[in-house]
């Protein structure tokens, strides 16, 4: 990283982590690998942590993954973020847009509250980007 440049802070969605751990050759995985190589600030939030860990069956892999994710920058959710999440969901619903997983509204609310980019591979974030200015990669 060049002197005087700022690191990019990126909240990495569960969809990207899963494909990364599975070594899938997908564009979002390539972007994630570039962020890691460039030593950008990789962030996680509680919802993403839960989604990743709940899908792991093997105890050793669970412990290893928990340790790895514990090294990420943790973005906490405040009460206002939960309210914002509900507002996002309700606003899109009034426009006839159904977000399939309400946790995606929570993840978007965290990203927006902390003013970080969201790296994802989930179409639920597209209308949030369009209607709320979510900074998505």
Where do the language-model regions lie?
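Short, well-structured N-terminal submotif of metal-dependent ribonuclease cores
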Residues: 1-44, 54-67
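Active-site neighborhoods of divalent-metal-dependent phosphate/nucleic-acid chemistry enzymes
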Residues: 2-6, 73-119
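Short beta-strand scaffold positions
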Residues: 12, 44, 76, 119-120
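Generic structural signal for small/hydrophobic residues in well-ordered secondary structure
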Residues: 13-14, 52, 85, 111
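Conserved glycosyltransferase catalytic-site signature
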Residues: 14, 46, 103-105
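A generic structural signal for short hydrophobic patches within well-formed alpha-helices
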Residues: 17-18, 49-52, 125
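A beta-strand edge to alpha-helix "cap/lid" segment located at domain peripheries
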Residues: 127-129, 135-136
